[in-house]
């Protein structure tokens, strides 16, 4: 279970999050909803270890992860799909997916069939450059890259942005 207790976050003198607490259980989908500018992305960044919290606790399966850097979080099975289609435009689709393998042992470095089942376009276009894909296809690539590690926790910020409604399931 992911547990957040009394999380405060500041950017300079501005308080972005105040006493946020939540629990997300294994196998559950938890959505953070709110209007623009209320701190959803800041919360994701704090959970992903890319923005330091001012105070509060973040734990996964009872272990404090709030003190870990992003590469250490990846080793613990946490994957992130940031807002804004973070892909490598000059790498092929296949190469982009393979960048998600960073923390996996060599024997486990194969794109799971489930990724291609979710996003068939990635298999069809695996030799095309990421920058040549449409916005929705780039978003599918970003999600696919996060899924190649079969994460224990998947954090996604605006995950369906630009994806055609018939692909969203």
Please annotate each region the language model reported.
Residues 2-4, 17:
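Conserved structural motif at the start of ABC-family nucleotide-binding domains
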Residues 33-35:
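The feature captures the beta-strand-to-loop junction immediately N-terminal to the Walker
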Residues 48:
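Helix-to-loop junction immediately C-terminal to a conserved catalytic motif
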Residues 56-64, 76, 110-111, 117:
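Conserved ABC transporter NBD signature motif
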Residues 129-133, 137:
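Conserved ABC ATPase signature
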Residues 146-147:
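ABC ATPase C-loop
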Residues 150:
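Conserved catalytic motifs of ABC-family nucleotide-binding domains
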Residues 154-158:
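Catalytic Walker B motif of ABC-type/P-loop ATPase nucleotide-binding domains
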């Amino acid at each position: 279970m992911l547990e957040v207790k009394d999380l405060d976050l500041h950017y300079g003198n501005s308080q972005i999050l105040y006493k946020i607490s939540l629990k997300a259980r294994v196998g559950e989908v938890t959505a953070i909803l709110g209007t623009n500018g209320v701190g959803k992305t800041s919360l994701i960044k704090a959970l992903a270890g890319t923005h330091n919290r001012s105070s509060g606790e973040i734990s996964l399966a009872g272990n404090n992860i709030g003190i870990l850097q992003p590469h250490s979080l990846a080793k613990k099975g946490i994957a992130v799909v940031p807002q804004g289609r973070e892909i490598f435009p000059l790498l092929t689709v296949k190469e982009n997916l393979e960048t998600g393998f960073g923390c996996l042992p060599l024997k486990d470095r194969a794109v799971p069939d489930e990724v291609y089942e979710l996003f068939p376009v990635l298999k069809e276009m695996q030799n095309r450059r990421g920058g040549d894909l449409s916005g929705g296809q780039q978003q599918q690539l970003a999600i696919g890259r996060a899924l190649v590690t079969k994460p224990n926790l998947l954090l996604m910020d605006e995950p369906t942005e630009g994806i055609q409604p018939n692909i969203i399931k």
